[in-house]
C-alpha cells in the first residue's frame, strides 16, 4: 500500500515522462502550484535544458523553479503553451476540477488558459463523483468580501474567510486578493456554477476548472499510475 506522498511522487515522475515524451525540445512549459506540483518541479529539474523556459502559476512555484535554475517567463510574453501540469483538490469523472486549496487559483487559471493541454496530477483520493466535499475557493477583492459571502451563501454554501494557517491574520493571495472557502456545495453542474460565481461583482476567480478542464489525468492508485484522457 502506498502512502499519499508516495502516490504524489509517482504521478510527478509519470508527468515528467509524459512531458518529455510529448513536448518537443525548446518549448515553454506551464507549471502549477502545490505539493504535487512541487514534486513535479523537482522531477523535471535535471531535464531543464529540454525547455526554453517555464511559466509559473504562483510566487511559491517561481521561487522553487528559480532555485533549480529554470528560466521563468512572464505569462504576458507567451501566446500559447503546449502543456500545463498541475494538481487538483478534486476531479470528477468528466475531468472537471476543483482547485485553489493552495490559494493560487487565479494564476493557475490564467496559465491553464494559455495551454493546449492540461495534465492533471493527483493521488486517488482526489477523484470524486460529485465535487464540493472540498470547500470551493473563491478569490475576491477585499472590499467586497461581505457582499460576496452573502451571495455565495444563497447558493447553499457555508462561507469562511481564509486565514493564514495557525494565525489569525487574513490569507492574502499573490494578487493581493482574499479567499472565501465555500463548504457544503454539491456541484452537479460545474460549468454553470463556475460562470454563475464569476458574475458576482467582487469575485476575481473561482476554483472550478470546468470550462477549461483537464485533458489528461495521471492518477496515483494502489495498482500504480493510471492515465486517462478526456
Ligand atoms: C493550489 C492548487 C493545488 O493544485 C491543489 O490544492 C492540490 O494541491 P496538492 O498537490 O498539494 O494536493 O490548486 O492552488
Stretches with model-predicted labels:
Residues 28-36:
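Glycine-rich beta-strand-to-loop/alpha-helix junction loops that act as flexible
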Residues 32-33, 53-57, 140:
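Small/polar loops that bind or transfer phosphate-bearing groups
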Residues 2-10, 20-21, 59-230:
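Conserved phosphate- and dinucleotide-binding cores of soluble alpha/beta proteins
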Residues 35-44:
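N-terminal active-site wall of soluble small-molecule enzyme domains
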Residues 19-27:
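Short helix-loop-beta connector
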Residues 11-19, 40:
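Generic hydrophobic alpha-helical segments
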Residues 26-29, 47-54, 96:
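Short active-site oxyanion
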Residues 44-48, 69:
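Active-site catalytic pocket residues across diverse enzymes, especially alpha/beta-hydrolases
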Amino acid at each position: 500500500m502506498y502512502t499519499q506522498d508516495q502516490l504524489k511522487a509517482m504521478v510527478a515522475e509519470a508527468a515528467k515522462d509524459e512531458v518529455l515524451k510529448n513536448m518537443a525540445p525548446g518549448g515553454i512549459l506551464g507549471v502549477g502550484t502545490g505539493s504535487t506540483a512541487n514534486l513535479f518541479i523537482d522531477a523535471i529539474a535535471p531535464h531543464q535544458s529540454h525547455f526554453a523556459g517555464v511559466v509559473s502559476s504562483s510566487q511559491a512555484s517561481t521561487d522553487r523553479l528559480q532555485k533549480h535554475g529554470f528560466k521563468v517567463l512572464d505569462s504576458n510574453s507567451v501566446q500559447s503553451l503546449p502543456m500545463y501540469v498541475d494538481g487538483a483538490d478534486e476531479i470528477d469523472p468528466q475531468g472537471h476540477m476543483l482547485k485553489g486549496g493552495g490559494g493560487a487559483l487565479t494564476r493557475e487559471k490564467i496559465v491553464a488558459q494559455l495551454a493546449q493541454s492540461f495534465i492533471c496530477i493527483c493521488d486517488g483520493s482526489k477523484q470524486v463523483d460529485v465535487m464540493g466535499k472540498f470547500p470551493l475557493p473563491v478569490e475576491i477583492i477585499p472590499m467586497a468580501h461581505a457582499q460576496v459571502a452573502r451571495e455565495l451563501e444563497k447558493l447553499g454554501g457555508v462561507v469562511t474567510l481564509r486565514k493564514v494557517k495557525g494565525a489569525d491574520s487574513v490569507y492574502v493571495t499573490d494578487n493581493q486578493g482574499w479567499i472565501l472557502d465555500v463548504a457544503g456545495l454539491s456541484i452537479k453542474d460545474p460549468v454553470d456554477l463556475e460562470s454563475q460565481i464569476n458574475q458576482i461583482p467582487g469575485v476575481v476567480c473561482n476554483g472550478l476548472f470546468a470550462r477549461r478542464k483537464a485533458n489528461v489525468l495521471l492518477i496515483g492508485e494502489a495498482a500504480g499510475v493510471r492515465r486517462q484522457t478526456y
